[in-house]
Swiss-Prot record:
Composition bias, Basic residues: 93-104
Protein role: One of the essential components for the initiation of protein synthesis. Protects formylmethionyl-tRNA from spontaneous hydrolysis and promotes its binding to the 30S ribosomal subunits. Also involved in the hydrolysis of GTP during the formation of the 70S ribosomal complex.
Name recorded for this polypeptide: Translation initiation factor IF-2, chloroplastic
GO molecular function: GTP binding; GTPase activity; translation initiation factor activity
Gene behind this protein: infB
Taxonomic source organism: Porphyra purpurea
Location of this chain's protein in the cell: Plastid, Chloroplast
Length: 763
């Protein structure tokens, strides 16, 4: 747009001739703003000033203001902008809404529609009035929708926050008392006593015990922590009473009308190699004693024997000291027990242990003195020795039958069986076959063809194919029932010992097995039992990373890295438990023993890889090698140790731990001497000595004592007599001693010579 020269001249002339004339200014056509001129003092100047200010809104540099006189379509958008701008000032999300509104503003660059400034201003005023009268419905609705959509999540957030606050402000209060059964980790202890882990760790740190939340502490430390926070700890006797009240090993008989007599369960106990298996071989007409590795029983073995048309179930238990848990379990499962004592060996520690188990369980028992074919004269002596264990024979006026037997000749074997049936009749053993089956797992293993399998002693009820069962953390739908003759049967009556298939995992030995109504119920109960760790898991946890009050005071910083890590594969759960029991007896103040994994099953390539990765020793016990495991071991240079006898395994682990011990020496005195004079030779101090006892040897260890305090300990480097080097000096002779690292000899120093003899390292 160009400036009109004619108009410009007319305007300038009017300014120059008459400043008060405003009419000529009105005659101007299409005035254009060039720059602002402020004139003072006259009314005409004021009018001109107002016109020029008005022209500010009409020039090409103010297109946004000119848009107010645009067509009605544009005015609608502007009216919404003005109204929405007022509404959004009071909204929390006004910035977001303002941005949306501004994005919808359209600027029209066509200036040809503006021809007259007067008409433009009038039209603009009218348009503004109309726009202000109309409510901005579309914009307000969109705003309401935005606000409405945010209300529900906000309410949910508030509800979640309030629930979190309640959970934080309402913690579980610490219990008044707790019962201790097994060692716990710091995290588990925190959950048990409802005390934060940090508080427990802080308390132990102040006691000089540094732990983490995953480390296991023994019952003494747990008791100390509980008492510090005002929580009582139940004694072992109280725990035993609670166990007896909830003992599921005892069959529950509901309806006496359905009860029938059941066969007695007889457990044979005694010291190792006293003839337990030989007795069962004679009764069962088998030869298992000669088939056993090492000549010892390492598992609980069950037999069903028929005598005089009556059934008797025998359980043969291991006699080795490592199988204490098995013997204890056998004593608790049995109706009648037989204690075997060899006539040529007498009463042994495992014999006394078996008697104590039976007396605690209040189980009637018979004493059978075996091997009388070798030594019959010792029978009376054994009877009198048993009195010290509160076992009084019928011959001496007591109630315990004592029967001399021979498994070689069969002498008095029938008398022993008759006595068993007589005791069973007196005990009135009964069960209800109409109930759901209930029993105890005697043994469990992983079968390579059938999966997890278990040997079950049925105490009450009848077990059927297809029954749903829960065994601790394991659930099962019984696929097969195998009797003692290795035959598949459809059902098993009370006092039967059968093998069952169809388990979800290998259960722990000693677990209670219960038949339930549905598969869903079995799975739910198995999940509930997961909160209480299985017997094996508890024993493994108590063995690994143990921290006790005794070890805290004896362990050194340099011993913390001395650790033997084991991966063990066994033949069954009974062996697993026995191995853990034996390993837990090892002292761990000098070397820590860590069982990384222990399970029944074959040694696999995965086990080999795990052993290689963790630098662990891979040990097998009476188990086989899976395909590919030997090749993996050769490739990864992993040595696999496979044992057949449990005490060989235990000694092998002990040797591994002892090899990590620092060498220990004992001092053996050799001789004594006394310093008579000190002289220098080539800037070296020489001690002139007289040997007062035995002799001195070159390169032997010596102690230099001054006023009964050791001032030096080391080796003799040079030993001279007059000017000659000698290897030894006998008592009564004089000699010169030189030690390069000790030059502070004084007259009157005592010298004690000794040898360091390596001691046998022990844990």
């Amino acid at each position: 747009m160009f400036l009109n020269n004619q108009n410009f001249e007319k305007k300038t002339s009017s300014y120059s001739t008459n400043n008060n004339s405003s009419e000529k200014i009105v005659d101007l056509k299409n005035p254009q703003f060039i720059y602002k001129i402020r004139l003072e003092s006259t009314s005409t100047d004021n009018l001109l000033h107002l016109d020029i200010d008005k022209s500010e809104t009409d020039g090409p540099n103010t297109e946004q203001h000119l848009e107010l006189s645009s067509p009605p379509r544009i005015d609608k958008k502007n009216k919404n902008f003005n109204k929405a701008h007022d509404l959004l000032d009071n909204k929390k999300n006004k910035n977001r809404q303002r941005k949306k509104i501004k994005n919808k503003i359209h600027i029209d660059d066509d200036d040809d529609n503006f021809s007259d400034s007067t008409s433009n201003s009038a039209q603009t005023a009218g348009d503004l009035a109309i726009s202000l009268m109309r409510p901005p419905k579309p914009r307000s609705q969109s705003i309401k929708k935005v606000i409405g959509n945010n209300k529900i999540p906000q309410q949910k957030k508030q509800q979640v926050a309030s629930s979190i606050d309640q959970s934080i402000t309402l913690p579980n209060s610490p219990p008044e008392s707790i019962s201790l059964i097994n060692p716990l980790t710091i995290q588990e202890l925190s959950r048990l006593i409802c005390i934060p882990e940090t508080d427990i760790i802080k308390y132990l740190f102040l006691k000089g015990i540094s732990v983490t939340i995953n480390q296991t502490v023994d019952n003494t430390i747990i008791s100390s922590v509980a008492k510090n926070f005002g929580i009582a700890v139940d004694s072992q006797e109280q725990n035993n009473k609670k166990k007896k009240l909830t003992n599921l090993d005892i069959p529950v008989i509901v309806d006496n009308h359905h009860c029938v007599n059941r066969p007695p369960v007889v457990t044979i106990l005694g010291h190792v190699d006293h003839g337990k298996t030989s007795l069962l071989d004679y009764i069962h007409k088998s030869n298992n004693a000669n088939k056993e590795v090492g000549g010892i029983t390492q598992n609980i073995v069950a037999y069903e024997v028929e005598f005089k048309h009556q059934q008797i179930v025998f359980l043969d238990t291991p006699g080795h000291e490592a199988f204490t848990s098995m013997r204890s379990r056998g004593a608790n499962l049995t109706d009648i027990a037989i204690i075997i004592i060899a006539a040529d060996d007498g009463i042994k520690p495992q014999t006394i242990e078996a008697i104590q188990h039976l007396q605690k369980a209040n189980v009637p028992f018979i004493v059978a003195i075996s091997k009388i074919d070798k030594n019959l004269d010792s029978v009376d002596k054994i009877q009198h020795d048993l009195v010290a264990q509160n076992v009084i024979s019928e011959k001496l006026g007591g109630s315990v039958p004592i029967i001399p037997i021979s498994s070689v000749t069969g002498e008095n074997i029938d008398k022993l069986l008759e006595t068993i049936l007589l005791l069973a009749e007196l005990e009135n053993l009964q069960a209800d076959p109409t109930q759901l089956a209930q029993g105890v797992i005697i043994e469990a293993h992983l079968d390579k063809f059938h999966g997890p399998a278990a040997t079950l002693l049925i105490q009450n009820g009848t077990l059927h194919i297809g029954d749903n069962m829960v065994i601790g953390m394991t659930h099962a739908k019984i696929r097969a029932i195998i009797n003692n003759a290795k035959q598949k049967i459809n059902l098993a009556a009370p006092s039967s010992v059968v093998e069952i298939w169809g388990l979800s995992s290998v259960p722990a030995t000693g677990e209670v097995a219960l038949v339930v109504n549905s598969d869903k119920e079995a799975k739910l109960k198995a999940i509930e039992n997961e909160s209480t760790n299985s017997i094996i898991v508890q024993k493994q946890k108590s063995l690994n990373s143990r921290i006790t009050l005794d070890t805290i005071s004896t362990i050194n910083a340099k011993d913390e890295n001395k650790q033997v890590t084991l991966i063990i594969k066994t033949d069954n759960q009974g062996s697993t438990e026995a191995i853990l029991d034996s390993l837990s007896q090892f002292p761990q103040s000098k070397v820590q023993l860590n069982v990384l994994s222990i399970f029944p099953g074959e040694i696999t390539a995965t086990d080999v890889e795990l052993a290689s990765t963790t630098n662990s020793s891979l040990i097998g016990f009476n188990t086989n090698f899976a395909p590919g495991s030997r090749q993996a071991a050769a490739k990864l240079n992993v040595i696999i140790e496979n044992y057949q006898i449990i005490y060989a395994l235990i000694e092998g682990v002990r040797e591994k731990m002892e090899t990590l011990l620092d060498p220990e020496y004992s001092e053996v005195p050799v001789g004594e001497a006394e310093v008579g004079t000190v002289f220098s030779l080539a800037n070296r101090k020489i001690a002139g000595c007289r040997v007062t006892n035995n002799k001195l040897l070159k390169n032997s260890w010596i102690k230099v004592l001054r006023e009964n305090e050791i001032v030096y300990q080391g080796k003799i480097e040079s030993l001279k007599r007059i000017r000659e080097d000698v290897e030894e000096i006998q008592a009564g002779n004089e000699c010169g001693i030189f030690i390069s690292e000790f030059q502070l000899w004084q007259t009157g120093d005592k010298i004690q010579s000794f040898d360091l003899v390596p001691k046998k390292r022990s844990l």
